[in-house]
Amino acid sequence: MYKHASSPRRRWIRLLFSTAAISAVAAAPFPASALASDDIVQFSVIPGSLDFGASPGLPGISTLVLNGQAQTISSRVANFEVSDASGTGLGWSISVSGDDGPGKSPVLKQYCPALECGDHAGPGYVADGSTLPANSLTLDSNGATFMPVHGSTGLRPAHQCNAGCFVDAPPLSPTKVVAAASGTGMGTFRTSGFSSSSLRLAAPDSTRRLQTGELYRVDLSWTLNSGP
């Protein structure tokens, strides 16, 4: 039986149809897929310390010229700095008092800074030497403030002696001069704005003269405490 062979034109049409079908399948969009990956960021904390960056230090006071009257002479308190890197947020405070440790005097007392001063041997306090009473030195922080430094942004501590505080207080009754309440004082803060009369010495009319080269001197103890 004679079979009619496919004409070249029919084969070409079938081939063209097959190619178009494959192209259509290849061009059809497939559903998009997304890959998710979980991640975390974490760090630990090592606490630092509560410390003075620059310790408090009262300046020297000019020479007192006796005139038979009670006198007050003044000087400017040097700035100091506190750094709280403890991370507790408990706050802190600074207190000061006279220091009665060995070789020290908690009140202004006659002192020889040289090997000898007249008939007194030195250096050191003169045994049974003249003294001024406790509470002769006043710190006045009126107008002073604390400035954050080194990028600190925490709440500032507060001065406590805007009406004046005695810094040569008895050792058992220290005077609080600065307080940072709970949640404040975190970071580093430096004092600013002490006036030229922020330290005052009250010298009574009974102040005794000293031998050549001698001074009145007092030892003070500044304490930085955790908690306000």
Predicted feature residues:
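Generic hydrophobic-segment detector
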Residues: R9-R10, R14, A26-A27, P133
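Long hydrophobic alpha-helices with heptad-repeat/coiled-coil character
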Residues: P8, S23-A26, R217, S221
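C-terminal segment of classical bacterial N-terminal signal peptides
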Residues: V25-A34
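N-terminal prepro-regions of secreted/extracellular proteins
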Residues: R10-W12, S33-A36
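Bacterial N-terminal signal peptides that target proteins for export
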Residues: H4-A20
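Signature of Gram-negative chaperone-usher
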Residues: L35-P228
